[in-house]
């Protein structure tokens, strides 16, 4: 198991119920691929450096997870096929991973 950071940019035009549904689907996908979520941060609506799908903004989510190495690409692929997911980036965590005591 390795530690990863999962960065996701969602469609900025989602209402609260759609946003909650997308977060639930993302959480389920992480669990289905054997990820143990350690930390979640909702960075909210942010301006993008360049428009994605003609939107100058995106709703940002950041997850810190521990998961099997061989499942990372499958997870990223599943998240990318969602219509409301604009971008997905999964990177190995650089900082020491400390569990809450």
UniProtKB/Swiss-Prot annotation:
Is-annotated flag, keyword Ribosomal protein? yes
GO CC, any one term: ribonucleoprotein complex
Q: What is the source species?
A: Thermus thermophilus (strain ATCC BAA-163 / DSM 7039 / HB27)
Q: Which GO terms describe its biological process?
A: translation
| Complex formation | Part of the 30S ribosomal subunit. Forms a tight heterodimer with protein bS18.
The record's GO molecular-function terms, alphabetically, read: small ribosomal subunit rRNA binding; structural constituent of ribosome
Q: According to its UniProt record, which protein family does this protein belong to?
A: Belongs to the bacterial ribosomal protein bS6 family.
Q: Name one Pfam family in it.
A: Ribosomal_S6
CDD domains from the UniProt entry: bS6
Q: What is this protein called?
A: Small ribosomal subunit protein bS6
Q: Per the UniProt record, which residue ranges are transmembrane?
A: none
What are the UniProt keywords, alphabetically? Ribonucleoprotein, Ribosomal protein, RNA-binding, rRNA-binding
Please, which domain of life does this record's source organism belong to? Bacteria
What is the purpose of this protein? Located on the outer edge of the platform on the body of the 30S subunit.
HAMAP family linked: Ribosomal_bS6 (MF_00360)
What the entry lists under InterPro entries is as follows: Ribosomal_bS6, Ribosomal_bS6_CS, Ribosomal_bS6_sf, Ribosomal_S6_plastid/chlpt, Transl_elong_EF1B/ribsomal_bS6
């Amino acid at each position: 198991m390795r530690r990863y950071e999962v960065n996701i940019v969602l469609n900025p035009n989602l209402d609260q119920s759609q946003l909650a549904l997308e977060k639930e689907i993302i959480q389920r996908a992480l669990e289905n691929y054997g990820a143990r979520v350690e930390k979640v941060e909702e960075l909210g609506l942010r301006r993008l450096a360049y428009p994605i799908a003609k939107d100058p903004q995106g709703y940002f989510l950041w997850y810190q997870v521990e998961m099997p190495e061989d499942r990372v690409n499958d997870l990223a692929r599943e998240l990318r096929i969602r219509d409301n997911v604009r971008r997905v980036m999964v990177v190995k965590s650089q900082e020491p991973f400390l569990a809450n005591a």
